[in-house]
Swiss-Prot record:
Its EC number is 3.4.24.-. The active site is at 130. One of its GO terms (molecular function) is metal ion binding. This is Mitochondrial inner membrane protease ATP23. Belongs to the peptidase M76 family. One of its GO terms (cellular component) is mitochondrial inner membrane. A divalent metal cation binds at residues 129, 133. It is a peripheral membrane protein. Keywords: Hydrolase, Membrane, Metal-binding, Metalloprotease, Mitochondrion, Mitochondrion inner membrane, Protease. It holds the Pfam family Peptidase_M76. The keyword Cell membrane does not apply. It is found in: Mitochondrion inner membrane. The gene is ATP23.
Length: 227
C-alpha cells in the first residue's frame, strides 16, 4: 500500500525528546514561545543568577582589596591598632536600592552594595569611606544621633576616602576646578546628614556640617594627609 504523502513520519522517542529539550532551551534563552508561568520562572532564575554573580564578584573584589589595596589595608590595620579589628565577615555584600553604594552600622558592620559598583575602584572608595566611619566609631565613640558627630564623620569619610577625587566628580556631572574637592566633601556630607532620622530639614543638615567643618576637614587621622 503506498505511503500517504500528506502524513509525516513519526520520530523515534529519543529524537522527539532531544528536539523538545533543544526547543525548550532555545525558548529559555530567547524568551520566545514561553507561557506566562514559564516567563515568570525564567525571570526568577535570571534574577537569582544575577544575584549570585554579583555576590561572587563583590566577595572577590573584597578579598583583593583587603589583601592588596594600600588604602584598605592601612585602614584595617589602624582599626586593629585602635582595638576594633574588622574581619571580612563584618563587610557584607548585598543588593541595594539605586541611590547607594554602601553603608556603616555600629551594630551590623559595613554594607557593600554588590549591584551598584561601576568597577573595583568604585568599591575601594566606598569601602574606604565606610571604614573611616568604623574608625571614627571605634576611636572617637561617635554618637550617630548627634548631628554634629555624624556631620564630622561624614566630612572625614568624604575627604579621606577618595570619594571626592576629580574623576568621580566628573562622572557625577560636577566640573568646577576652584575648590572642587571642598565643595564635594561639604555637599556629600550634607546629603548624608540629611538622611539621619534626627535631621528634619536641609537647613539643619547644612548647619551641622558648617559648625564642625574647620576642625573635621583638617582632621586626617589615621592618615598624615589626604590620600
Amino acid at each position: 500500500m503506498p505511503e500517504n504523502p500528506s502524513s509525516s513520519p513519526t520520530e523515534p522517542p529519543e529524537q522527539s525528546a532531544a528536539f523538545e529539550k533543544w526547543r525548550s532551551g532555545l525558548a529559555q534563552f530567547t524568551g520566545l514561545g514561553l507561557s506566562e508561568s514559564e516567563k515568570a520562572e525564567r525571570e526568577r532564575l535570571k534574577a537569582q543568577g544575577k544575584l549570585a554573580k554579583d555576590w561572587d564578584k563583590c566577595e572577590g573584589w573584597k578579598r583583593d582589596l583587603m589583601n592588596y589595596s594600600p588604602m584598605i589595608t592601612f585602614l584595617l590595620n589602624h582599626l586593629k591598632l585602635a582595638g576594633c579589628p574588622f574581619p571580612s565577615s563584618a563587610m557584607q555584600c548585598h543588593p541595594c536600592p539605586e541611590n547607594r553604594a554602601g553603608g556603616f552600622s555600629p551594630d551590623h558592620g559595613i554594607l557593600l552594595c554588590q549591584d551598584r559598583f561601576f568597577n573595583k575602584k568604585h568599591m575601594e572608595d566606598t569601602l574606604a569611606h565606610e571604614l573611616v566611619h568604623a574608625f571614627d566609631h571605634c576611636r572617637f565613640k561617635v554618637d550617630w544621633g548627634n548631628l554634629r558627630h555624624h556631620a564630622c564623620s561624614e566630612i572625614r569619610a568624604a575627604n579621606l576616602s577618595g570619594d571626592c577625587r576629580f574623576t568621580r566628580e566628573v562622572k557625577r556631572g560636577f566640573y568646577a576646578f576652584n575648590k572642587q574637592h571642598q565643595a564635594c566633601v561639604k555637599r556629600r556630607a550634607i546629603l548624608s546628614v540629611l538622611a539621619n532620622p534626627a535631621c528634619t530639614s536641609p537647613e539643619m543638615a547644612e548647619k551641622a556640617v558648617n559648625e564642625v567643618w574647620e576642625s573635621c576637614f583638617t582632621d586626617t587621622r589615621p592618615f598624615d594627609e589626604i590620600y
